[in-house]
Amino acid sequence: MATVNQLVRKPRQKPDAKSNVAALQACPQRRGVCTRVYTTTPKKPNSALRKVCRVRLTNGFEVSSYIGGEGHNLQEHSVVLIRGGRVKDLPGVRYHTVRGTLDCAGVSSRKQARSKYGAKRPKS
């Protein structure tokens, strides 16, 4: 154990926190090109076909990104914007595609939580 005098001279170091979204490199979002669009199954106990795309980012990283919402128009070579945010039941998927920007269309017929899915306000 360190003495008080040693701690006065050199205080204890806090370990550096590791980022969960390293590929963003401290940016809020990053642009990239879809290299593969596919569906995958979640971990137990869930069951579904989750829509995922593999994205080559402008900084050279290649990451898996979840496509939220019902239906999408993405295919290979689509340009997308990704943000941080993991999908708990898909191992290795730590990013979300931003709906309603670049080549990714918003979710049509969305009434609630529209801003999260890039949906315009419906005409009343």
Curated annotation (Swiss-Prot):
Keyword Protease: no
Single biological process term from Gene Ontology: translation
Region Disordered: start-end pairs: 1-22
Domain of life the protein comes from: Bacteria
Alphabetized GO MF terms: rRNA binding; structural constituent of ribosome; tRNA binding
Keywords: Methylation, Ribonucleoprotein, Ribosomal protein, RNA-binding, rRNA-binding, tRNA-binding
Modified residues (3-methylthioaspartic acid): 89
One Gene Ontology CC term in the entry: small ribosomal subunit
Annotated family: Belongs to the universal ribosomal protein uS12 family.
Quaternary structure and interacting proteins, as annotated: Part of the 30S ribosomal subunit. Contacts proteins S8 and S17. May interact with IF1 in the 30S initiation complex.
Function of the protein: With S4 and S5 plays an important role in translational accuracy. Interacts with and stabilizes bases of the 16S rRNA that are involved in tRNA selection in the A site and with the mRNA backbone. Located at the interface of the 30S and 50S subunits, it traverses the body of the 30S subunit contacting proteins on the other side and probably holding the rRNA structure together. The combined cluster of proteins S8, S12 and S17 appears to hold together the shoulder and platform of the 30S subunit.
The protein's name in its UniProt record: Small ribosomal subunit protein uS12
The species this protein was found in: Pseudoalteromonas atlantica (strain T6c / ATCC BAA-1087)
